[in-house]
Amino acid sequence: MEKIVICLMVIFLGTVAHKSSFQEQDLLLIRMRQLIDIVDQLKNYVNDLDPESLPAPEDVKRHCERSAFSCFQKVQLKAANTGGNEQIINVLTKQLKRKLPPTNAGRRQKHRPACPSCDSYEKAPPKEFLERLKSLIQKMIHQHLS
């Protein structure tokens, strides 16, 4: 009887642990897909954005994706004060700045590679900035699924 209870507990705990890791993955994928939608919406307003060039990471090294993503989040995308789209742009940029859910890979990584600072990235106009951001998010999704 005791052995059966122990076996059932092991099976139950294995199922719960497996399920929680899938939930984390799902949250991250959902968030990244939301980010792609937000970037696509911002592209509709690219002519209403301040034309100032912004640091936009490109060709990001493996394991530096989250660092590069945080560089994108630190940038201040601003409306050019032309038209009534300022409020929409502000809402979308606030949504871009929400943190990504944590991942097990990020927690396990003890030795993190040296990633370039945000200032070291080449500056790009808003349209290219948004394209690079979308490309990075797609890369992160692909790596997460593989």
Curated annotation (Swiss-Prot):
GO MF terms listed in the record are:
cytokine activity; interleukin-2 receptor binding
- What Pfam families is this protein classified in? IL15
Q: What is its main location?
A: secreted
Entry's PANTHER family? INTERLEUKIN-15-RELATED, INTERLEUKIN-21
The gene behind this protein is IL21
The protein's UniProt keywords, in alphabetical order, are: Cytokine, Disulfide bond, Secreted, Signal
Q: Is NAD given among the entry's keywords?
A: no
Q: Where in the cell is it found?
A: Secreted
**Record-given protein name:** Interleukin-21
The Gene Ontology biological process terms listed for this entry are: cell maturation; cellular response to virus; germinal center B cell differentiation; natural killer cell differentiation; natural killer cell mediated cytotoxicity; positive regulation of B cell proliferation; positive regulation of cytokine production; positive regulation of immunoglobulin production
Q: Where is this region: Disordered?
A: 100-120
The source organism is Canis lupus familiaris (Dog)
Fetch the InterPro entries from UniProt: 4_helix_cytokine-like_core (IPR009079), IL-15/IL-21_fam (IPR003443)
What S-S linkages are listed for this chain? C64-C115, C71-C118
Described purpose of this protein according to its UniProt entry: Cytokine with immunoregulatory activity. May promote the transition between innate and adaptive immunity. Induces the production of IgG(1) and IgG(3) in B-cells. Implicated in the generation and maintenance of T follicular helper (Tfh) cells and the formation of germinal-centers. Together with IL6, control the early generation of Tfh cells and are critical for an effective antibody response to acute viral infection. May play a role in proliferation and maturation of natural killer (NK) cells in synergy with IL15.
Q: Can you name a GO cellular component term? A: extracellular space
Q: Where is the signal peptide?
A: 1-17
